Amino acid sequence: MSDTMQLDSIWHNGKQYRKGYTTGSCATAAAKVAALMVLRQQVIDHVSIVTPSGVTLRLNVEQPLIEGQQATAAIRKDGGDDVDATHGMLIFARVTLCDHGEIHLRGGEGVGTVTRKGVGLPVGSSAINRTPRQTIEAAVREAIGPLRGAEVEIFAPEGEERAKKTYNGRLGILGGISIIGTTGIVTPMSEESWKRSLAIELEMKRSAGAEKVILVPGNHGERFVREQLGLDGQLVVTMSNFVGYMLQEAVRLGFRHIMLVGHPGKLVKVAAGIFHTHSHIADGRMETLIAYLALMGASQELLLEVSHCDTTEAAMELIAEHGLQAVYDRIAERICERMSEMLRFAVNPPRCDAIMFSFDNQILGTSRPLNDILEAMR
């Protein structure tokens, strides 16, 4: 781990949980220091980066090497107390200076290759997600200045073996790990502590007088609510995978209007009565889509194609090709019904709504006419 890292620990029920950093942060730091070393022609043993969440990391550099106009460096992944398949492995970057003025990024040994649609990256590309791509390119550009160019390769010698312990294979990402992380920071907690920390935000908003709340799975949902729906971000609370728990907490606290907003990859599960959406607990995404497509008269051929999809995005592409996007409204309506069924024993049952959106921020389905929902939420 780094010798100095501006990360706070988390305390829950008297226990301290140590934060860590993502493979994306490792790749960004490795690329930055490799670029600096090739420019200065000098080995560097520490590097600092600012993560997308605004946290500054100062990390140890391992295996630095300079060879003419090329340098290589590695950062060791540390997930804190959230130990996953990539914990402890080295993430390398190799940077070669060029005269073309552009930064070209690719994955090398141990970084997976995308072989199927539906993961948000082009088929055939390296499994380096959008945010890490941006932070890597920005860090290298900062290091080399506006005029130089660079070829940047991210690689992880242990990646192919470590990836066998992840879901990459099921998603069609083959040959290695993914370079991921939207915030750059790993925040570990036990599930109960995590749920409780989410509920605390609900309590804070209710105590401040809020009667309406929008529950989202994560950061993307919050941005969508603010930027696409034009609603106050103060209405938003993250629910993660704990849909049922957060609904019950919201009712217990007295919220009068509860809305779920998220990508179908999470929310279609709720239409099937699944209120804990982590893939380790339950899935049912394709089965739910197939059921509602069948009710709309979809062909047997389409239903079979959807059954073979590994991701919701892949199924959504098929649905669009067949012009059956109206299925999302039906699913959103059923989500709303499921919410109401769960909360029917409340003394004052709340109004429930649901909105689903795509990764490119298009509204897919709503439980009621959109204007009615937005007016009620404002």
From Swiss-Prot:
Protein family: Belongs to the CbiD family.
Organism per entry: Photorhabdus laumondii subsp. laumondii (strain DSM 15139 / CIP 105565 / TT01)
Pfam families: CbiD
InterPro entries xref list: CbiD, CbiD_sf
Keywords: Cobalamin biosynthesis, Methyltransferase, S-adenosyl-L-methionine, Transferase
Protein name: Cobalt-precorrin-5B C(1)-methyltransferase
BP terms from Gene Ontology: anaerobic cobalamin biosynthetic process; methylation
EC number: 2.1.1.195
Pathway terms, separated by semicolons: Cofactor biosynthesis; adenosylcobalamin biosynthesis; cob(II)yrinate a,c-diamide from sirohydrochlorin (anaerobic route): step 6/10
Transmembrane residue ranges: none
GO molecular function: cobalt-precorrin-5B C1-methyltransferase activity
Catalytic activity: Co-precorrin-5B + S-adenosyl-L-methionine = Co-precorrin-6A + S-adenosyl-L-homocysteine
Entry-linked PANTHER family: COBALT-PRECORRIN-5B C(1)-METHYLTRANSFERASE (PTHR35863:SF1)
